């Protein structure tokens, strides 16, 4: 949620004597319907003073359930049939860089992509925690739990623009609990993401309520909260206050609401990404297959959001009969359905970011919680495989057009340049200008905690 002031405020006063801290304070007052003696021209001048380079941002796309790395980005055509499967690799526009034949659009923009084929340290069970915060859920955690990446960014950086939250989640709630993103951990509710999906989107517009009425309601709420604040020792009230201020800011601004409204987008761009039904949860317990979420994510970072997370479809293809009683549930049938849509929407995001001049400012990572077994099962599926995983990255002034790492002849083990989840997140923090070697956040007991696990450093092949 919106964190107006934090320990990492940068810079001092602007040339007109208005400090950045004052600018942020003014934004809060404006969102609450009170200006503290500041005139409207001064408010507008103060907001204009925050202009400059577009804020850096990250989009994190979670492929729910664990995608099959050896059928997507690490094909082994010379392996036995029971390992290689039916897919064949195709050349990309980068010499020596091959991917699945079902991804012709991605092949055409591979010079803008990086595939990491050697992610290690995965767990064997479904748990989205590691995807969202880079932490091994099997290891001890501090009181309150580890915060996810966007929560940490919210705490350290706050909002990039006065009326935009630092962190938005476009993740759909899955009925299978382990597929869902974790909470804010020990950083608390004040830094939880804005979750605009479903009925809550109606809260992003005024619906006829005037700013004066909003200000009156806010005054009453703050008066009633005084007593509760005096006796509250859990920190939840601070989170509530921050959430309320966030909501007030959004209610008085259309920027985020407009970003979520695809009717305002060029229909040709919407068509390029494709659309899906958000009410259809894949296999009943996964996320919906909604390519338009990637477009909404682009619109949100363009509106000033620092971190956008989203979950996409379901990739846990064990074969056999699925939870909906679907008999023809072969992994290769599912891939034939899923891969073309994935190719279309991800390549659309790649090209869209470049065409709109956002590619250097927005880094994207696409991954799941683990890989899949090299050997195809008797019921024509691939099971969980924690030994190795893969990720697709693009954007963010990184050196793309490359493959990092390698696996053995059956895509079962990393044999070159193993990469950890922590290294990927160190790279994303680096993109945002946050030094993971020097920066910490305090837990509930006041102990400084490092941002990534195992003293991981940014991936040198990308940023070094």
Predicted stretch roles:
Residues 1-464:
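Ligand-binding pockets and gating/stacking loops
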């Amino acid at each position: 949620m919106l964190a107006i002031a934090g320990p990492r405020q940068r810079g001092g006063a602007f040339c007109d004597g208005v400090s950045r801290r004052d600018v942020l304070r003014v934004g809060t007052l404006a969102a609450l319907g009170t200006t503290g003696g500041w005139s409207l021209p001064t408010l507008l001048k103060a907001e204009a003073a925050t202009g400059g380079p577009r804020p850096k941002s990250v989009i994190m796309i979670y492929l729910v359930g664990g995608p099959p790395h050896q059928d997507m980005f690490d094909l082994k055509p010379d392996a036995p049939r029971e390992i290689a499967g039916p897919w064949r690799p195709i050349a990309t526009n980068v010499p020596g860089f091959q991917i699945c034949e079902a991804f012709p659009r991605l092949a055409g923009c591979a010079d803008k992509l990086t595939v990491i084929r050697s992610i290690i340290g995965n767990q064997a069970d479904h748990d989205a925690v590691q995807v969202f915060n880079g932490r091994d859920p099997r290891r001890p955690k501090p009181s309150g739990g580890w915060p996810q990446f966007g929560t940490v960014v919210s705490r350290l950086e706050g909002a990039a623009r006065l009326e935009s939250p630092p962190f938005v989640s476009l993740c759909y709630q899955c009925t299978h609990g382990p597929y869902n993103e974790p909470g804010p951990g020990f950083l608390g509710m004040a830094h939880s993401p804005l979750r605009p999906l479903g009925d809550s989107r109606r809260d992003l517009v005024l619906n006829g309520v005037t700013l004066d009425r909003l200000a009156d309601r806010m005054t009453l709420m703050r008066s009633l909260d005084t007593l509760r604040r005096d006796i509250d020792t859990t920190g939840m009230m601070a989170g509530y206050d921050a959430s309320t201020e966030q909501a007030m800011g959004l209610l008085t601004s259309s920027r985020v609401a407009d970003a979520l409204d695809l009717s305002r987008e060029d229909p040709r761009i919407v068509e390029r990404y494709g659309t899906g039904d958000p009410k259809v949860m894949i296999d009943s317990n996964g996320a919906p297959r909604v390519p338009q979420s990637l477009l909404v994510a682009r619109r949100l970072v363009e509106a000033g959001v620092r971190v956008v997370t989203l979950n996409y479809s379901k990739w846990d293809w064990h074969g056999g009969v699925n939870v909906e009683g679907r008999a023809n549930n072969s992994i290769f049938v599912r891939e034939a359905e899923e891969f073309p849509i994935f190719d279309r929407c991800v390549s659309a995001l790649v090209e869209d970011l470049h065409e709109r001049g956002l590619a250097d400012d927005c880094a994207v990572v696409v991954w799941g919680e683990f890989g899949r077994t090299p050997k195809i099962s008797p019921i024509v599926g691939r099971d969980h495989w924690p030994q190795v995983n893969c990720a697709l990255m693009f954007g963010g002034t990184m050196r793309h057009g490359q493959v990092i790492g390698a696996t053995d002849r059956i895509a079962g083990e990393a044999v070159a340049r193993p990469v950890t989840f922590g290294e990927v997140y160190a790279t994303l923090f680096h993109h945002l200008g946050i030094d993971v070697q020097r920066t910490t956040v305090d837990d509930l007991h006041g102990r400084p905690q490092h941002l990534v696990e195992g003293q991981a450093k940014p991936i040198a092949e990308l940023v070094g």
